């Protein structure tokens, strides 16, 4: 694993923005996993998790939104490369004690650059979709802890957010 860079990769020598040139890099298998959490009040969480009510519809809608967002990441993040996604997976876990939905997004590719931004975008949009579908019951929903959890592949190798 390589050490952190002492410079920002999207700025040239004069401090101007630029897209990183990946033309000379070799394609390799890459994976990134991102997480986030959506915390809400007891009423909204109860409606979300009530059998026969919202859980399936809300979480399935959030899953589809996350996949679409990962596929459009380069349209949303100005200097992000468009890349061929081999896989996008989104999982949810429920924490009844804190009324929280945990989001986990995994992206894989075989390409010249990593899929961290796609995984982070997928986790973020899944969380935003849950917010959108539950906000009628709780305007104070909190989206938190959007973060890269794991990445592997490419020159920098494997990294974990411990």
From Swiss-Prot:
Lyase is among the record's keywords: yes
Any single GO BP term: Mo-molybdopterin cofactor biosynthetic process
Sites where the protein binds substrate: 79-81, 117-118
Residues annotated as catalytic: 132
Any single Pfam family the record assigns to this protein: MoaC
EC number in record: 4.6.1.17
InterPro entries assigned: MoaC (IPR023045), MoaC_bact/euk (IPR047594), MoaC_sf (IPR036522), MoCo_biosynth_MoaA/MoaC (IPR050105), Mopterin_CF_biosynth-C_dom (IPR002820)
Keywords on record: Lyase, Molybdenum cofactor biosynthesis
Chemical reaction(s) catalysed: (8S)-3',8-cyclo-7,8-dihydroguanosine 5'-triphosphate = cyclic pyranopterin phosphate + diphosphate
Record's keyword annotation contains Lyase: yes
Pathway membership, UniProt: Cofactor biosynthesis; molybdopterin biosynthesis
GO molecular function: cyclic pyranopterin monophosphate synthase activity
SUPFAM superfamilies: Molybdenum cofactor biosynthesis protein C, MoaC
Subunit structure: Homohexamer; trimer of dimers.
Family: Belongs to the MoaC family.
Function: Catalyzes the conversion of (8S)-3',8-cyclo-7,8-dihydroguanosine 5'-triphosphate to cyclic pyranopterin monophosphate (cPMP).
The name this protein goes by in its record: Cyclic pyranopterin monophosphate synthase
Taxonomic path: Bacteria, Pseudomonadati, Pseudomonadota, Betaproteobacteria, Burkholderiales
